Regions:
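Acidic, mature catalytic/reactive cores of soluble proteins
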Residues: 2-663
């Protein structure tokens, strides 16, 4: 619980924002620590909310839509929604159990109020009762504030962000609220317009509520929408509980696993099946620096790793939806045709710099789009083939045209594997011969032979292994980051999942080098050395979880458990992670919430439980082999449980807009 003063205009105290000067010389408020954000969403849109319940990012219609709130990227013109007590307050928050519905509790000297934030979603009326992919969602952010004890004055402030701040907001009155160019704000109480801003003060006594809805500007507004919010909340809660109730994992750290699974599901875009890397753009990897990227896109590699994590928990619909998305993105000479796509399957992701925005804490530029879509990364072919192997072995299908495309892709890899690329980390430097990329080319051909039921690539695979052994291993026996370099790369910690043949002792030597060069008490750096960009980034959360995999594989079970516990302690108060963590301060860095961080947590927790019950021999084989074994073990364990699992009736999470009078 943290203590704060009340909002602007509160009596009996002074409100002082911390201030610093950006590199441009402009004053700006000290930004909300990324660690202090929670997230709500509905598999279409997403919102980031601070500990004090201020909405600082909100994209309503889709993840990549122009946000109506983006204060975290510019505290002057970015837009926000703020409702907080007028008196000094203490605040605590949590997610409602097994949901992505956020509850924030304000406590003042005079009373207590509970804030509920959610974005409505549920089962589509035409979907089957067990279909958790075909969804109905409303492009709304709903906030319900209920005084539970005593009384409280709540101050409401909203500034809409329009067109990334390039347009002056226009505000006009409508029934029950105001229309903003780009959105509407409905409110159960009177609010005032002050130029582009909306404000009001509401006095609540115990049992009374303040109800707010921020909705996309194109939405028709039903007359009684504010009276329907409790029904929408019930449906949304039921959906999330029903979805997470299908999770097969019941082992240690189940709460952390379920929270990570809920985060991954929230980052799926239901209309197409795409999975985004994170919910935001341009949250910096270096505070005040230029390592600021747009992650509201679907990286093929990150998505397939997310689906490994969801598959091991027993989910099958999301992988099938992504398979359709991926093959629909284009069937060129090779598959996939690029490493990242837009959430609607867009190929052109031209990177633009929004130079008029201050950036998070003065971190410029703010970027929209991502130039990585033009990069050549050889590891992606192995990641896709590896996942498709698992997908088919768990009952998924591959049509003949898709198999033919995979054959062409394997032929391409067999011909071009010896060429340089940008690597797993998308370095914006000259292409290099990344060792992990070479190993993943071997994985691509190995898994292709399984999928195609052939042995056509044995000879080139032997050549790949010889080349990695000759040029990819340093004199001290560890895997290099690149040929002709003695640097080490933390992505090598994923080697145990590849089944790539290495000389005896190579993996242990690699772990030792990573421990010596990249590990800190808070986490693991990706790499050291020049990558074509300025500044030193933080430790990478996913790498921290990968370390325990390598430790387990080399028989260090106790050390792996201790390291996993260390990584769990790095989560924020609601169990979420950004991309990176500052090694000294513990401050979150990078976009939020980060899919790669959460899928790595799931992988680590399941792996620890897997080894505990199956012994170290279960770690042999490929990533797909491990997942299949883990799924079988979970199914057997759950069948042995005598207590039936509580279920949510499918009718509880049916979102029928017509029946609710919202269609």
């Amino acid at each position: 619980m943290c203590s704060c003063d009340g909002g602007p205009g509160a009596a009996g105290f002074a409100w002082h924002w911390g201030r610093h000067v950006t590199p441009s010389g402009r004053d700006t408020e000290t930004p909300t620590d990324i660690r202090d954000y929670a997230v709500v969403g509905n598999c279409h849109g997403i919102a980031l909310i601070s500990k004090e319940a201020r909405v600082e990012w909100c994209a309503l219609e889709s993840f990549d839509a122009s946000p109506v709130c983006f204060r975290m990227l510019d505290d002057e013109i970015g837009g926000y929604l703020d409702t907080r007590p007028m008196q000094p307050f203490e605040v605590a928050r949590r997610y409602l159990p097994k949901t992505n519905v956020l509850e924030t509790t304000f406590t003042t000297a005079s009373g207590t109020a509970r804030v509920i934030d959610f974005m409505p979603l549920g089962r589509h009326p035409d979907a089957a009762p067990d279909d958790f992919v075909r969804l109905q969602a409303l492009p709304w952010l709903v906030r319900i504030i209920r005084a539970t004890e005593g009384e409280m004055d709540i101050r409401l402030d909203m500034l809409p962000g329009v067109g990334w701040g390039t347009c002056e907001p226009e505000v006009r009155r409508i029934d029950h609220g105001v229309a903003l160019n780009g959105a509407s704000l409905l409110c159960s109480h009177a609010i005032e317009i002050h130029g582009a801003r909306v404000s009001g003060v509401v006095h609540l006594r115990a049992g009374e509520q303040l109800r707010l809805v921020v909705m996309a500007g194109h939405c028709a507004i039903p007359a009684d929408v504010l009276s329907r919010l409790d029904q929408l909340l019930d449906i949304t809660v039921a959906y999330w509980k029903a979805w997470i109730g299908r999770c097969g994992y019941k082992g240690p750290h189940v709460d952390a696993v379920e929270r990570s699974a809920l985060a991954l599901k929230l980052l799926t875009y239901a209309p197409t099946g795409a999975i985004i890397a994170a919910g935001t753009t341009s949250l910096p990897e270096v505070l005040g620096g230029s390592r600021n990227w747009d992650y509201r896109l679907s990286w093929v590699r990150d998505s397939t790793l997310s689906l490994f994590a969801l598959s091991v928990l027993g989910y099958r619909e999301e992988p099938e939806a992504f398979r359709k998305f991926l093959f629909n993105c284009g069937t060129g000479a090779v598959f996939p045709t690029q490493i990242v796509y837009g959430i609607h399957g867009e190929h052109d992701l031209t990177e633009r710099e929004l130079t008029h925005l201050r950036g998070y804490g003065g971190s410029r530029p703010v970027r929209v789009g991502n130039a990585a879509h033009r990069q050549r990364q050889f590891d992606v072919y192995g990641e896709v083939m590896d996942w498709l192997t698992l997908h088919r072995e768990l009952g998924g299908s591959l049509r003949p045209p898709e198999l033919e495309l995979l054959r062409r892709t394997a032929d391409y890899v067999a011909e071009h594997w010896c060429e340089p690329g940008q690597g797993f980390w998308e370095e914006r430097d000259e292409p290099q011969h990344f060792v992990y990329g070479k190993m993943m080319c071997w994985v691509a051909l190995d898994r292709a032979q399984v999928l195609l039921q052939c042995r056509d690539y044995d000879a080139v695979m032997r050549t790949m292994v010889e080349d990695v052994h000759r040029r990819g291993i340093a004199p001290r026996g560890y895997l290099r980051k690149c040929y002709d370099s003695d640097l080490v790369d933390a992505v090598a910690l994923r080697t145990p999942t590849l089944d790539f043949p290495l000389p005896p002792g190579c993996l242990q030597a690699t772990i030792d080098e990573v421990m010596d060069k990249l590990v800190t008490p808070r986490g693991v750096y990706r790499y050291k050395g020049s990558d074509g960009l300025d500044g030193d980034e933080g430790t990478f959360v996913a790498c921290g979880f990968w370390l325990l995999d390598a430790l387990l594989f080399t028989g260090k079970k106790l050390q792996a458990q201790e390291w996993f516990d260390t990584m769990l302690r790095q989560a924020n108060d609601v169990g979420l992670y950004a991309e990176e963590i500052d090694a000294e301060s513990g401050r979150f860095l990078g976009n939020f919430p980060q899919a790669l961080s959460h899928l790595a947590l799931i992988h680590g927790a399941v792996l620890l439980d897997f080894v505990e019950h199956g012994g170290p021999e279960v770690l042999q084989g490929t990533h797909a082999d491990r997942v299949q074994h883990a799924v079988r073990m979970m199914e057997e364990a759950n069948r042995a449980r005598q207590a039936p699992q509580a279920e949510v009736d499918a009718g509880d999470w049916l979102l029928d807009l017509a029946a609710l009078g919202l269609g």
